[in-house]
Amino acid sequence: MIQMQSILEVADNSGAKKVMCIKVLGGSHHMVAKLGDVIVVSVKDAIPGGKVKKGDVYKGLIVRTKTGVVRPDGSTIKFDQNALVLLNKQDEPIGTRVFGPVTRELRAKKYVRIMSLAEEVL
């Protein structure tokens, strides 16, 4: 579960490496974000020459969490890190590649574009 001040890895090639959650979107009582939720993040670490700079504020879609997700058949999928994909104002991915696996639950949230960019779908 991701909350304010959580540090996350960036799973795309936008140029950012680490970001910090500054707001969880989705209502006044939405305190934590889970897999597939959109949050507002600030870039804390970026590579030189990338599309984003340190201090920039973007939306991000969470694609991997340490908490994981429970499937309807009872199986659980957990990851070693919390990771997200940066989104622009139109909720489209900034990067052109997504590194690492993503889950099938993103299809239900209408993020098929990110699933097609990913290396592996679990």
From Swiss-Prot:
Report whether Ribosomal protein shows up as a keyword of the record.
yes
Q: Name one GO cellular component term.
A: cytosolic large ribosomal subunit
The family database entries (Pfam families) matched by this protein are listed as: Ribosomal_L14
Query: Could you tell me which SUPFAM superfamilies the record lists for this protein?
Result: Ribosomal protein L14
* An individual GO BP term: translation
Task: Tell me which UniProt keywords the record has, alphabetically.
Answer: Ribonucleoprotein, Ribosomal protein, RNA-binding, rRNA-binding
Q: Please provide, alphabetically and separated by semicolons, the GO molecular function terms listed in this UniProt record.
A: large ribosomal subunit rRNA binding; structural constituent of ribosome
PROSITE patterns recorded: RIBOSOMAL_L14
Function as written in the Swiss-Prot or TrEMBL entry = Binds to 23S rRNA. Forms part of two intersubunit bridges in the 70S ribosome.
Indicate the quaternary assembly: Part of the 50S ribosomal subunit. Forms a cluster with proteins L3 and L19. In the 70S ribosome, L14 and L19 interact and together make contacts with the 16S rRNA in bridges B5 and B8.
Q: Note the HAMAP family from the entry.
A: Ribosomal_uL14 (MF_01367)
What family name appears in the similarity comment? Belongs to the universal ribosomal protein uL14 family.
User: Mind telling me what this protein is named?
Assistant: Large ribosomal subunit protein uL14
Source species: Rickettsia rickettsii (strain Sheila Smith)
